[in-house]
Curated annotation (Swiss-Prot):
Cross-referenced InterPro entries: GIY-YIG_endonuc, GIY-YIG_endonuc_sf, GIY-YIG_UvrC_Cho, Hlx-hairpin-Hlx_DNA-bd_motif, RuvA_2-like, UVR_dom, UVR_dom_sf, UvrABC_protein_C
Domain of life according to the entry: Bacteria
Family: Belongs to the UvrC family.
Alphabetical keyword list: Cytoplasm, DNA damage, DNA excision, DNA repair, Excision nuclease, SOS response
Major localization listed first in the record, in broad terms: cytoplasm
Gene Ontology BP annotations: nucleotide-excision repair; SOS response
Lineage, top ranks: Bacteria, Bacillati, Actinomycetota, Actinomycetes, Micrococcales
Protein name, UniProt field: UvrABC system protein C
Organism: Arthrobacter sp. (strain FB24)
Complex formation: Interacts with UvrB in an incision complex.
UVR domain ranges (all copies): 207-242
Domain GIY-YIG per the UniProt entry, residue ranges: 16-95
Compartment annotation: Cytoplasm
Length: 669
C-alpha cells in the first residue's frame, strides 16, 4: 500500500476554486472521483490526518498513488463533471447505490421492433421501461390481467422467430392474450400503440382507459351487440382490479418520488416510493457504503444525481416533485440539472406536515427494515468472501492480496470453432463488464496448451501496449490540460455510453482451467512477455487439484475450503462463458450459403436478396440490373455479386448447393 505522503501535493499548488478531483492507483486507473467547493480544503482533509479517516477512505488514500484535479467555473459544472466521470471511470471507491434485487419489475422493451412485456430483475437495460417493483406473485397476476386488455407480445425471441418462420402464433395468440404481430394479425405500428397504452396505464392513466372502455361498452349495448359488451365489461373489471391494488395516498394530481434513508456510521439504506396520480406505483431500494464522512444532505445529493442521471438516459420520466428527508447539498444547482433532464421544472422539497410527511415516515420505516435485512445477509456473504480470499492467498503462499483474479478457459469440439473466455473477479465478486471472449485460429488451435499460451499472450501483450501508450501520452506536453478540456466539453453529455475498458488493469492471480500442461503454458506466456508480478495457478477437473508452474505435485485444498470453493466458482463461470460463445460461433457456422463469401454482402442484404429472388439459384442466374432492384443493393454491389458467381462457377465447374449442416437439408432447389 502506498504512503499518502508520497504523492501529497503541496498546499500552495492546490487552488481554492470549486472543482473535481480524481485519485488514481499505481496502474493509472481512477479509483475515486469527488467534487468540492474549495479543492484545497477538501484535498488537504485527506492528507492532514489519514489515521482519523473512515476505514474505506483510509483504504482509498493508501490504494492511490496520485491525485489530479480540474477547476470549473461553478458548482453546477462541478456537479455535472463529477457525474460524467463517475459514469465513465466507474471508480471502485465511489458511493454506489446498489439496487435491491429482492423484488422484480414489470418491464416493456420499447427498443424492440415488437415490444415485449416481461418480468425482470437486476440492472436496468437501455430502451426498456420499468414499473414496480412488485412481489413475485402480484406481478404475475398483474401481467396476466393486463394482457387481456392490452395483448402485447410476451414471448421470448426464440418463440417469436419460430412463429414467424412457421406462420402460426404461439398459444397466447390463440387465446387472445397476444395480438400476434409475428404472423401479421396487427402491424408493427398497431402493436407498438398497444405497448404504449400498456405503459400509459401502468404510468397512472388508468382512469382514461377505463372511461374509454365504458364508452365502448355503452356503444355495444346501443347496437345490441351484447357479446362484445360483455367482453368489454370483463376488461373494465380487470383494469379496475389492477387499479385498486394501489391505494390513494396523496391528491390525485400528485406526481412525486418520495425518498427516505436510514444510516449508520458505515452504510445507508435508501427507499423511494414512486407516486403517480396520487397512488404508489412502485418502490425501489438501494444500499450504499460510505467512503467519506458524508452528511445526510451529501448522501441525498449523490442519490438524486445517480438515480435520475440513469433514469434521464433511459426513461425521461422524472416527476414534477421530489420529496427528500433533508435538503441536499447544492440544492439549487441540483434542481437546475434535474430540470434540464426532465425538460421542465423539478421541485426538491422536504415535507414537514400533512399526508406527504406521513408517507415519508412510511418510506423511512421501509429503509430501516431494508438496512437491517441487508446487514444480516451481508454479514455471512462478506465473511465467506474474505475467508475465501485469505485462505487462497495463504494456501498458495502469495505475498499480495487477491484483489483481482482472472480465469481463462478453452472450449471447442474436436478442434473446431476453438474459443477462449476470460472472466474477472474483484474482491471476491464477478465483474462482468470486464469479461472477454477470444477466437483462436491457426497453429494456436491445435491443442489446449497452444490455445492457452496464445490467449495469455494476447491478453497481456494488450496490457503492456496500453500501459506503454498511457505512459507516452502522459509525457506529452499539454496532456493534462487536453484531458481537462475534453472532460469539461463533454460534461453536458449524459447520454453517451462510457468507453469500454480494455486490458489496462492487470490481475494479481491468473487461474487456468486445466492441470500441469495448461499452467506451464500460461506461465511461459507471461515469462516471454517479461511479466513477473502476476501469479498463475491451474484447477484440474475431477480431482480438483491446484497446480503451480513447474511443480511436480499439486496443492491439495480441503474439500471444505472456502478458497477451493471460490476457485471452483470462477472456473465454472469461465467454462459457462466459453461454452456459450462456442455455441454461438458453432451455430453461425451450421448454415452454409454461397452468399456468405460475397464481399460487401452483409446479413441484411442477403435477406433482402432472398426475399426478392426466393433462392440462391435464382440470385446466381440474375443479371446485375435485376440484382440492383433489391433493397440495399447498388449497381457496384450487383456487379460484384455477378462477378463472384461467375468466378466461382469457372473455378469449380459446378454449382455447390447451400446446405443446412444441422439437418443435412439442401436449402436451395
Amino acid at each position: 500500500m502506498a504512503d499518502p505522503a508520497s504523492y501529497r501535493p503541496q498546499t500552495g499548488e492546490i487552488p481554492t476554486n470549486p472543482g473535481v478531483y480524481r485519485f488514481r492507483d499505481p496502474h493509472g486507473r481512477v479509483i475515486y472521483v469527488g467534487k468540492a467547493k474549495s479543492l484545497r480544503s477538501r484535498l488537504n482533509s485527506y492528507f492532514a490526518n489519514p489515521g482519523g479517516l473512515l476505514p474505506k477512505t483510509y483504504a482509498m488514500v493508501h490504494a492511490a498513488s496520485s491525485v489530479e484535479w480540474t477547476v470549473v467555473a461553478s458548482e453546477l459544472e462541478s456537479l455535472q463533471l463529477e457525474y460524467t466521470w463517475i459514469k465513465e471511470f466507474k471508480p471502485r471507491f465511489n458511493v454506489v447505490f446498489r439496487d435491491d434485487k429482492t423484488y422484480p419489475y414489470l418491464a416493456v422493451t420499447m427498443g424492440e421492433k415488437f415490444p415485449r412485456v416481461q418480468v425482470l430483475r437486476g440492472e436496468r437495460r437501455k430502451g426498456t421501461r420499468y414499473f414496480g417493483p412488485y412481489t413475485a406473485g402480484a406481478i404475475r397476476e398483474t401481467m396476466d390481467t393486463l394482457l387481456r386488455v392490452f395483448p402485447v407480445r410476451s414471448c421470448s425471441p426464440g418463440v417469436l422467430k419460430r412463429a414467424q418462420a412457421s406462420g402460426r402464433p404461439c398459444l397466447l395468440g390463440y387465446i387472445d392474450k397476444c395480438a400476434a404481430p409475428c404472423v401479421g394479425r396487427v402491424t408493427p405500428e398497431e402493436h407498438r400503440a398497444l405497448a404504449e397504452d400498456f405503459c400509459s396505464f401502468m404510468g397512472g392513466e388508468a382512469k382514461r382507459f377505463i372511461g374509454r372502455l365504458e364508452k365502448d361498452m355503452a356503444a355495444a349495448v346501443a347496437e345490441l351487440d351484447y357479446e362484445r359488451a360483455a367482453r368489454v365489461r370483463d376488461d373494465i373489471i380487470a383494469l379496475r382490479k389492477v387499479f385498486e391494488r394501489n391505494a390513494v395516498v396523496l391528491a390525485e394530481d400528485t406526481d412525486a418520488d418520495v425518498f427516505a434513508l436510514h444510516e449508520d456510521e458505515l452504510e445507508a439504506a435508501v427507499q423511494v416510493f414512486h407516486v403517480r396520480g396520487g397512488r404508489v406505483r412502485g418502490q425501489r431500494g438501494w444500499v450504499v457504503e460510505k467512503v467519506e464522512d458524508f452528511t445526510t444532505p451529501d448522501l441525498v445529493e449523490h442519490l438524486l444525481q445517480q438515480v435520475y442521471g440513469e433514469e434521464g438516459e433511459t426513461q425521461g420520466r422524472l416527476p414534477r416533485e421530489v420529496l427528500v428527508p433533508e435538503e441536499p447539498s447544492n440544492a439549487a444547482e441540483l434542481a437546475q440539472w434535474l430540470a434540464g433532464l426532465r425538460g421542465a421544472k423539478v421541485d426538491i422539497r422536504v415535507p414537514r406536515r400533512g399526508d406527504k410527511a406521513a408517507l415519508m415516515s412510511t418510506v423511512r420505516e421501509n429503509a430501516e427494515h431494508a438496512l437491517k435485512l441487508h446487514k444480516s445477509r451481508r454479514a455471512g456473504d462478506l465473511t465467506n468472501r474474505s475467508l475465501a480470499l485469505q485462505e487462497l492467498q495463504e494456501a498458495l503462499d502469495l505475498p499480495v492480496a487477491l484483489l483481482r483474479i482472472e480465469c481463462f478457459d478453452i472450449s471447442h469440439v474436436q478442434g473446431t470453432n476453438v474459443v477462449a473466455s476470460m472472466v474477472v473477479v474483484e474482491d471476491g465478486l464477478p465483474k462482468k463488464s470486464d469479461y472477454r471472449k477470444f477466437s483462436i485460429t491457426g497453429a494456436a488451435a491445435v491443442d489446449d496448451t497452444a490455445a492457452m499460451h496464445d490467449v495469455l499472450t494476447r491478453r497481456f501483450r494488450n496490457y503492456l501496449q496500453e500501459k506503454a501508450a498511457q505512459a507516452e501520452a502522459a509525457q506529452l506536453p499539454g496532456h493534462q490540460a487536453a484531458l481537462e478540456a475534453m472532460a469539461v466539453a463533454s460534461m453536458q453529455d449524459t447520454t453517451t455510453p462510457a468507453p469500454r475498458a480494455k486490458f489496462a488493469y492487470p490481475p494479481n492471480l491468473v487461474v487456468v482451467d486445466g492441470g500441469k500442461p495448461q499452467v506451464n503454458a500460461a506461465a511461459r506466456a507471461l515469462a516471454e512477455l517479461g511479466i513477473d508480478d502476476v501469479y498463475v495457478v491451474g484447477l484440474a477437473k475431477r480431482l480438483e487439484e491446484v497446480w503451480l508452474p513447474d511443480s511436480d505435485f499439486p496443492v491439495i485444498l480441503p474439500r471444505t475450503s472456502e478458497g477451493l470453493y471460490l476457485l471452483q466458482r470462477i472456473r465454472d463461470e469461465a467454462h459457462r462463458f466459453a461454452i456459450t460463445f462456442h455455441r454461438q460461433k458453432r451455430g453461425k457456422a451450421m448454415t452454409v450459403s454461397a452468399l456468405d463469401s460475397v464481399p460487401g454482402l452483409g446479413e441484411a442484404k442477403r435477406k433482402a436478396l432472398l426475399a426478392q429472388f426466393g433462392s440462391v439459384k435464382s440470385i446466381r442466374t440474375a443479371s446485375a440490373a435485376e440484382l440492383a432492384t433489391a433493397k440495399g443493393i447498388g449497381p457496384s454491389l450487383a456487379d460484384a455479386i455477378v462477378s463472384h458467381f461467375s468466378n466461382g462457377a469457372a473455378a469449380s465447374g459446378a454449382e455447390a448447393p447451400s446446405i443446412n449442416m444441422t439437418t443435412g437439408e439442401i436449402i436451395e432447389t
